[in-house]
Amino acid sequence: MPRFVYFCFALIALLPISWTMDGILITDVEIHVDVCQISCKASNTASLLINDAPFTPMCNSAGDQIFFTYNGTAAISDLKNVTFILEVTTDTKNCTFTANYTGYFTPDPKSKPFQLGFASATLNRDMGKVTKTIMEDSGEMVEQDFSNSSAVPTPASTTPLPQSTVAHLTIAYVHLQYEETKTVVNKNGGAVAVAVIEGIALIAILAFLGYRTMVNHKLQNSTRTNGLYGYDNNNSSRITVPDAMRMSDIPPPRDPMYASPPTPLSQPTPARNTVMTTQELVVPTANSSAAQPSTTSNGQFNDPFATLESW
């Protein structure tokens, strides 16, 4: 890409920062010539240059005045003197001439933006060398210089007719003003930039540590699974057992200590007691009576209902 394109991009990027505009937008101009009448007809017209720019307005006639309407096309980019050059061509019964008028007006810099304003300007005629061909009494046509005269005679007689010297303009315009909002400079910009960079670096470090921890944990699980079962359950790892073996065929790990159940010990059956303690049920022996349980000498276990007296 050529350097000129880079320069254009940089210029466009800087426009909102440095570009300001303070000018006017001319909407209507009313033109009146001090002598003779002008109109919008082809033989009696006027053209107006604004700052040497030939804007094309809409023309309307009203009596001895014409109105130029620009519809927002006549934009002036500053509030300095606005120069007008008016060219008038008049061909009427009592007045025939073509003249140029020049002048300027200064817009009011104190006018409020985007409000309609009015101003007036007087344009002076550029006299130059004015010549006219007249007929003398002898019938001969003679060209005379009327540059220093305020009146020009008609060709048919020596009676002078008034000559136009000035043109009056009334300008309606809108003050256009645009100024980019000033950016407040942050004095702590360097510190803020450093803090942002440090924050980004800290986030990157934490992300790296988290990723490394995840990878190590995954590797440990893979190693443990491979050591216990002979295969790795990770999708990204290689199976270490033959394809014919299924996961359900692999038994769970066993401790060698419990590979076989313990052998029961051989112990003699304990002898059955014939007489229990006083706190236990008495088991009768073969020599004892079936009706009466054996008792001790103190008669502890005598039947309390054995005699009628007990009732």
Swiss-Prot record:
It comes from the Eukaryota. Residues 210-311 are cytoplasmic. Changing H32 to E/R: Reduced dsRNA uptake. GO terms for cellular component: apical plasma membrane; cytoplasm; plasma membrane. GO terms for biological process: endocytosis; regulatory ncRNA-mediated post-transcriptional gene silencing; RNA transport. Changing H168 to E/R: Reduced dsRNA uptake. Changing H175A: Reduced dsRNA uptake but complete rescue of gene silencing defect in sid-2 deletion mutant. Expressed in the intestinal lumen. Also present, at lower levels, in the excretory duct cells. Residues 287-311 are annotated as: Disordered. It is a single-pass type I membrane protein. Residues 287-301 have a biased composition (Polar residues). The keyword Transport applies. The chain crosses the membrane at residues 189-209. It is found in: Apical cell membrane; Cytoplasm. Residues 21-188 are extracellular. Residues 1-20 form the signal peptide. Keywords: Cell membrane, Cytoplasm, Endocytosis, Membrane, RNA-mediated gene silencing, Signal, Transmembrane, Transmembrane helix, Transport. The extracellular domain is necessary for the uptake of dsRNA. The avoidance behavior is transgenerationally inherited, and thus progeny display this same aversion despite never having been exposed to this pathogenic bacteria. Plays a role in RNA-mediated gene silencing by mediating endocytic uptake of double-stranded RNA (dsRNA) ingested from the environment into intestinal cells from the intestinal lumen. Selective for dsRNAs of at least 50 bp. Required for avoidance behavior induced by small RNAs derived from pathogenic bacteria such as P.aeruginosa. This is Systemic RNA interference defective protein 2. It comes from Caenorhabditis elegans. The lineage of its organism: Eukaryota, Metazoa, Ecdysozoa, Nematoda, Chromadorea. The gene is sid-2.
